[in-house]
Regions:
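Conserved AMP-binding/adenylate-forming core of the ANL superfamily
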Residues: 1-49, 66-71, 134-143, 153, ...
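A short helix-loop-beta submotif of the ANL/AMP-binding
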Residues: 20, 33, 39-67, 77-82, ...
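Conserved S/T- and glycine-rich ATP-binding loop of Class I adenylate-forming
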Residues: 34, 51, 159, 165-168, ...
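ATP-dependent adenylate-forming carboxylate-activation enzymes
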Residues: 38-39, 59-76, 88-89, 93-96, ...
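Structural core segment of the AMP-binding/adenylate-forming
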Residues: 53-139, 249, 256-257
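Conserved pre-ATP/AMP-binding loop-to-beta segment of ANL
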Residues: 116, 128-164, 171, 179-181, ...
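Conserved AMP-binding/adenylation subdomain of ANL enzymes
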Residues: 181-201, 210-251, 266-269
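Gly/Ser/Thr-rich phosphate-binding loop
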Residues: 224, 250-255, 264-307
């Protein structure tokens, strides 16, 4: 929808501390599971960081999964809190998420509280109260005092997040990742493989249901800024993401091989109008990038880039 929001490190820190206060207020503690059914927005990142800080276990799904996909995954982990956004947009179309809430709660009895986020730049959709479920609006969190309690230190092996297999061979399988392992692996990939530096701007086109979302968020540990995008990557313009990358001075641009294939099919000419002066690295994942894909990047996007 063209909405842009920016937060400083200080603002992020304050918001996360308020979320910690909220978690403690509703009796969320270490090893409790927090499930998120949200688009890729700042509040989702903040809720994840807050969960990590108190030792809770995070798990997220993208709104495009649909109700059966969410129930298949979250019913296995028995979350105590569900974080959900009221709606999301794809290719200009508004899609109601909050109307799915009763069906989810009916099947996942472990959920005791629901935190509703509003889609960035849009008014919150109206929602009905649900019996025996405490429902909170994210605006309530903004009014809370920041948590000043010293955070507990957890073991290297303490659980951080639960991700899922694709579900192509039956029910999606839960995969629990430890905090120390994830942090160490991501720092290695970011700083050694991708040369991410403090003050870099890191972007990856991903939803919250893909492991690249977790990879993107961890770039904060390298003192880089992260750029979030939600929606259809070619809305109104096939080179939309590249235009954003240029405007935001992105240094690492992450996409899928399928995205590059689409640029090839649509014969997008990037070099002629988008200079991408700050861009150092392009990452492609999801499937192997073809020989044509490599050649297209160097010929049409940027010659002097680490791909």
């Amino acid at each position: 929808n063209g909405y842009r929001e920016q937060k400083s490190w200080k603002e992020l820190n304050i918001d996360v501390k308020k979320i910690i206060t909220f978690y403690k207020k509703i009796n969320i503690s270490e090893k409790d599971r927090i499930a998120a059914y949200t688009p890729n927005q700042i509040e989702t990142v903040e809720c994840f960081l807050g969960a990590s800080a108190i030792g809770s276990i995070w798990s997220s799904c993208s709104p495009d999964f649909g109700v059966p996909g969410v129930i298949e995954r979250f019913s296995q982990i028995k979350p105590k809190l569900l974080v959900i956004t009221d709606k999301y947009y794809y290719n200009g179309k508004e899609i109601n998420i909050i109307e799915r809430l009763p069906k989810i709660l009916k099947k996942i009895k472990s959920i005791k509280s629901v935190l509703i986020l509003n889609y960035p730049g849009k008014k919150l959709r109206k929602f009905n109260k649900i019996k025996n479920i405490k429902i909170y609006n994210f605006t309530e969190i903004r009014k809370l005092e920041i948590s000043r309690n010293k955070l507990k230190k957890f073991d290297f092996d303490h659980e951080l997040a639960i991700l899922y297999s694709s579900g192509t061979t039956g029910k999606p399988k839960c995969i629990c990742h430890r905090s120390g392992g994830v942090l160490l692996q991501h720092l290695k990939e970011h700083q050694l493989h991708c040369n991410i530096k403090p003050n870099d701007n890191v972007f990856y086109f991903t939803t919250c249901g893909w492991m690249m979302w977790n990879w993107l968020v961890t770039a904060l540990a390298s003192k880089a800024s992260i750029l979030l995008f939600d929606g259809f990557p070619m809305h109104k313009s096939p080179d939309l993401l590249l235009k954003i990358a240029n405007k935001e001075k992105v240094t690492l641009f992450g996409i899928s091989a399928k995205y590059i294939d689409q640029l090839i099919k649509q014969k997008v000419k990037v070099k002629e109008k988008i200079k991408l002066k700050s861009l150092k690295t392009i990452c492609s994942t999801g499937s192997p990038l073809s020989k044509d894909g490599f050649e297209f990047v160097y010929r049409n996007i940027k010659k002097n880039v680490h791909l």
